[in-house]
Amino acid sequence: MYVTPALLFLSAYLILPTLETVYLSFFDGRSRNFVGLKNYVFAFTDHTMLVAFRNNLLWLVLVTGISVSLGLIIAVLVDKVRYEAIAKSIIFLPMAISFVGASVIWKFVYAYRPAGAEQIGLLNAIVTSLGFAPVGWLVERSVNNFALIAIMIWLYTGFCMVILSAAVKGIPADVIEAARIDGANSWQIFWRITIPMIRSTLLVVSTTMVILVLKVFDIVFVMTGGNQGTEVIASLMIKEMFNYRNFGRGSTIAVILLLLIVPVMITNIRRFKAQEKLR
């Protein structure tokens, strides 16, 4: 009885739109003619879609791996040092900036002008001062995806650090002290005590980052608009749905994105329930 309003709200604003999206994915661009699996065949054979899948995989590996690794390293290194609060505040600060705001900031960092012209972009100013030619960080296909990925790493390393820092501080001091008495060095303590004892938190942070990366859109949209081979699944979905007005293909891409995210969410929920039972 008490959860009925919440269930009604969930049905109206989550379940019904999801079912409608799945339904539209089996129709043509105008949602008039049933086309079966044609849109799904398109999604897994179209060159642009395959590029988007490849880019999302690249984001998934690099952003998740580097953000979590850096967050863990920083959490361990600054633990219990005098300037811990200041260091953590500075590293966490980018989290206060929206994706769009961060993209605008980094546009100035990556700004490019032809060789011989004064460089207003911070990165190209450094490059040219060292005697090299300026680089079109957002237009050269060999580097533009990595340039975009760096933005999200900058944004979310602080998030990973804060969560993992709390887990590191939760390790009993007597366990660490006993290990030191037994002759364990810092490296052994890190791999044999710290990592095993915060493994559940590491998994939660990693899966959370996976979900965030799969949904990435703002950075790509603001920085490149998905051009020059930087398309990702979410940006392609927006283009098909709103730019090209192809509701069938747009819905299909949305369903695929949902199918990629839901298993990760379910894994997180199950892990949370398992931890609750242990408490």
From Swiss-Prot:
SUPFAM superfamilies: MetI-like (SSF161098). GO terms for cellular component: plasma membrane. Induction: Expression is very low in cells grown in basal medium but increases significantly after a salt shock. InterPro entries: ABC_transporter_permease, MetI-like, MetI-like_sf. It is a multi-pass membrane protein. Residues 53-270 form the ABC transmembrane type-1 domain. The gene is ggtC. The chain crosses the membrane at residues 7-27, 58-78, 90-110, 120-140, 146-166, 202-222, 247-267. The complex is composed of two ATP-binding proteins (GgtA), two transmembrane proteins (GgtC and GgtD) and a solute-binding protein (GgtB). It is found in: Cell membrane. Belongs to the binding-protein-dependent transport system permease family. This is Osmoprotective compounds uptake permease protein GgtC. It comes from the Bacteria. Disruption phenotype: Inactivation of the gene results in loss of the ability to take up glucosylglycerol and sucrose, as well as to accumulate exogenous trehalose. Insertion causes leakage of glucosylglycerol from the cells into the medium. It holds the Pfam family BPD_transp_1.
